[in-house]
UniProtKB/Swiss-Prot annotation:
GO terms for biological process: cellular response to oxidative stress. Residues 21-40 are annotated as: Disordered. This is Probable Fe(2+)-trafficking protein. Could be a mediator in iron transactions between iron acquisition and iron-requiring processes, such as synthesis and/or repair of Fe-S clusters in biosynthetic enzymes.
Amino acid sequence: MTATFNPQANTVFCRKYQQDLPKMPHPPFPNKKGQELQETVSEKAWKEWLEQQTMLINENHLSMLDPKAKQFLTEQRDKFLDNEDYERAQGWTPES
C-alpha cells in the first residue's frame, strides 16, 4: 500500500489568522499545551510570537527562572495568538 499525500495534514486552521496555514512541524512544548498549540496555531503565527516574546524578554529584563515572568509571557502569548490587546515592546511598531 502506497501512502498518499494529504495536504490538509500539513495545515491547521490558525486561531490568529483564521485560515488554513502550514502547521508547526513539532509541538513547541513537550506537553498537552504544546500539542494544543501545534493543532491550533500556524508556523507563521508561532514564529511571529517568538519574535514578540524575545522583545518582551529583552525590554523588560525578564528572567525565565521567575515564575511571574513565565506567567506574564503565557498570558501575553495567549492574547497575541487570540488577536487580543497584548503588551508590546516600547520601541516596536507594527508593520503597516
